[in-house]
Amino acid sequence: MKKREAFAKLPSVDSILSNNNIKNLLDNYPRELILESIRDVIESKRQEIIRIKEDEVETFDIEEDILIDDIIQSTKNKFQLSIQKVINATGIVIHTNLGRSKLSPNVQSELIDIAFGYSNLEYNLENGKRGSRYDHLVQIIKRLTGAEDAVIVNNNAAAVLLVLNTIAKDGEVIVSRGELVEVGGSFRISSIMELGSGKLVEVGSTNKTHIEDYKSGFSEETKAIMKVHTSNYRILGFTESVGIEELKQQEEFKNIPIIEDLGSGVFVDLSKYGLTYEPTVIDSLKKGVDIVTFSGDKMLGGPQAGIIVGKKEYIEKMKKNQLTRALRVDKMKIAALEATLRMYLDEKEAIRNIPTLKMITCSLKELDEKAGILLNKIQELNIDADIQKEKNVSQVGGGSMPLEKLINLVYLIWKKDLEKVKRI
């Protein structure tokens, strides 16, 4: 058989459309989508013929059932949502590639109400006048953090950009070289800072920065001092850094705002739950930081957002910055964030109901109970395999608490019928 004979075996679009399975498909999917899938599959077979050698053409065959199945699957793949629910079996709690923090089930009803109806997003129900979308969040954030004011944008990088564009545009911002982190995907804090301010003044070295380094970087053009919490890595050993309190004591910096990018945004002192202490938003403000920025979807356990808290005089300027309009959050994020924040009014409720906090503070006893439930489900599959429970370690993830190792339990499964395990 020659290649031209193989090409002749390829069915026409019309002949495929007459297939009963394809007719059934037309009842549930758009015709144009099915036609596209038919053409894609036929073209794939055509390319397959082109690639094979002449002496292999004899073995080439087109099985109609397989062809139809490919068309059906291709159509379904095109129609289904690209973003899908997955099981996180990585051992990383806040996995950036898997969507970071899970929202609490308590947030679900709030989201449904707001998503499927109208809302008072920018309407004041008390006076019947236009309101601000930020009013829904400012009071609860002020209560939880002790900040004078707050504004929310769509992520923490946007928060840093807005802060610097408002406070330090056309001026200089001092930052330690040891705090110029890369936040993932080749995005560096230095690049974001340069977009927002006129000039970045790097001081000190990677492992050591002294107060004199900050003083040497100070000039008449200095508009702010930036502190970046290195939440996604630690430099250990021969190191030194300058704390907020020491910076606040310097006469030169008396009228210079200190900005701190906390990144992960912790509201609870996790050392009370047997974990390493991680600086909280409240602690930073108590130390005298003028502006703090942090993420909503990391340790806070809410939706993606960049939260800015601090002195009212600076926050008011940010709210008037034209960038705020470009970076603003929508009603869905506001609803999810408010519902998440309200759980923090009772710390025990937050630990119990916010999935991220619940997972990282979970005791070994609780894990063992969950492991027992999982084992029962595995055994129900009647897998002919050896199953062994072992202790293991996981991580917080999301650029948070890089040195913290969380004890967990895993099942090792090996031998026969491993295909069934995929259904767990």
Regions found by a protein language model. Name each.
Residues 54-58, 83-84, 236, 255-256, ...:
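Flexible, glycine/charged-enriched surface loops at secondary-structure junctions
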Residues 313, 321, 329-378, 393, ...:
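Structural motif of enzymes handling amino- and sulfur-group chemistry
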Residues 368-424:
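Conserved C-terminal alpha-helix-loop-beta "cap" of PLP-dependent enzymes
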Residues 80, 128-344:
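Conserved PLP-enzyme active-site core in the AAT-like
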Residues 82-87, 191, 294-297, 348, ...:
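Short, flexible, solvent-exposed loop/turn segments with mixed acidic/basic and small polar residues
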Residues 1-76:
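Long amphipathic alpha-helical segments
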Residues 43, 89-90, 101-126:
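Glycine-rich phosphate-binding segment of PLP-dependent enzymes
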